[in-house]
């Protein structure tokens, strides 16, 4: 696995390549904890348990944009699920989920077809299984609201019934999956409709867990001493004599130009961080400021004719040349930091040959590659939660 992936490479990726490989498994030998518990997990997208609860596995990071609800809506639409029975979870990183990346407003775009076919394919198998059990033609049965109903007689089986009885014994090939006719927008009952976001209740009652909420037995706390510039700063010297006097101080860690202090608890780490004395060579970017960055881009916008234009419609130069009067205006927006409201954090654990990392990451796939390279281990020894 490589971590050398650029934004240009992302944009080149197709929806299929960036999404999922959908393989519908035959029920029988359990291949996951969910299936071992009697649930049906036809693919990497969702699980239906014996009670009929459908859990959609969200592999995109929830950053306030509602992506968990949006992706669950896509599955629920084609699955003909009752929205009240839909749940979501956020699985640990795994190559089986494909590219685990969130950004650029790509989540729905990249996964729409794959998620739709995951739901539609499962619906097809549920109908076939229920029809066979009821001894009725599948052509006379429909799926609606988490159940399969035989239209002439009114007989029905819920999805939970079908799963708990282990009735699904068929599978779908890739070709069959591709041939399934998806709904037209005019037929949507869930997509595009006002719907309560699935992540809001836990975020309002305090049950939602963020990276910073992770606590492990015996964990210690580290605080990084940040350099004075974004890039280019080099450590000249480190004086931790005062930091060592802080109650709870454990050690000072230096890896190249990264310096951190480790302590028994968070407050001790903060106190020790404040007493660290690091001398820096600020390097070539010592005088870079928001004003200098702004001026640099302003000069490029006015004078660099090779720079690409965001909008290029018509003959602006020709129109200006013919105009009796012209008006020039500059529009500015504040410099915005690309950072979450939650303080940046990561909890790491090494146990039984596996590294576990708990963090609010929007690019789990790259994290696995970078971390495996950093620690000199195989990517499968890295788990990003």
What are these regions (language model features)?
Residues 1-385:
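Structural alpha/beta core scaffold segments of enzyme domains
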């Amino acid at each position: 696995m490589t971590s050398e992936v650029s934004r240009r490479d992302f944009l080149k990726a197709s929806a299929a390549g960036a999404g999922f490989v959908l393989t519908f498994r035959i029920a029988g030998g359990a291949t996951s904890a969910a299936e071992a518990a009697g649930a049906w997990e036809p693919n990497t997208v969702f699980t239906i348990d014996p009670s009929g609860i459908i859990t959609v596995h969200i592999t995109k990071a929830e950053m306030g944009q509602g992506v968990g609800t949006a992706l669950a809506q896509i599955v629920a639409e084609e699955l003909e699920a009752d929205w009240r029975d839909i749940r979501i979870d956020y699985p640990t990183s795994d190559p089986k989920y494909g590219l685990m990346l969130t950004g650029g407003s790509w989540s729905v775009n990249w996964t729409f077809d794959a998620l739709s076919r995951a739901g539609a394919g499962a619906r097809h198998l549920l109908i076939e299984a229920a029809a066979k059990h009821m001894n009725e033609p599948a052509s006379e049965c429909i799926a609606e609201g988490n159940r399969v109903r035989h239209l002439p007689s009114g007989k029905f089986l819920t999805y939970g019934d079908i799963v708990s009885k282990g009735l699904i014994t068929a599978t779908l090939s890739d070709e069959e999956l591709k041939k399934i006719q998806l709904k037209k927008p005019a037929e949507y009952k869930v997509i595009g409709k006002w719907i309560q976001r699935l992540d809001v209740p836990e975020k309002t009652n305090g049950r939602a867990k963020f990276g910073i909420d992770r606590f492990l037995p015996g964990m210690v706390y580290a605080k990084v001493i940040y350099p004075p510039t974004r890039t280019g700063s080099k450590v000249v010297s480190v004086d931790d004599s005062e930091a060592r006097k802080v109650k709870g101080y454990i050690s000072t860690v230096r890896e190249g130009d990264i310096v951190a202090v480790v302590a028994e608890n968070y407050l001790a780490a903060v106190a020790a961080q404040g007493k660290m004395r690091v001398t820096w060579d600020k390097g070539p970017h010592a005088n870079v400021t928001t004003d200098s960055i702004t001026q640099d881009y302003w000069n490029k916008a006015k004078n660099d004719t090779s720079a690409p234009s965001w909008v290029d419609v018509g003959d602006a130069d020709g129109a200006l040349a013919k105009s009796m009067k012209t008006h020039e205006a500059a529009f500015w927006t504040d410099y915005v930091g690309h950072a979450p409201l939650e303080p940046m954090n990561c909890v790491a654990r090494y146990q039984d040959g596996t590294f576990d990392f708990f963090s609010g990451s929007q690019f789990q796939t790259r994290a696995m590659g970078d971390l495996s390279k950093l620690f000199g281990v195989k990517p499968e020894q890295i788990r990003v939660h």
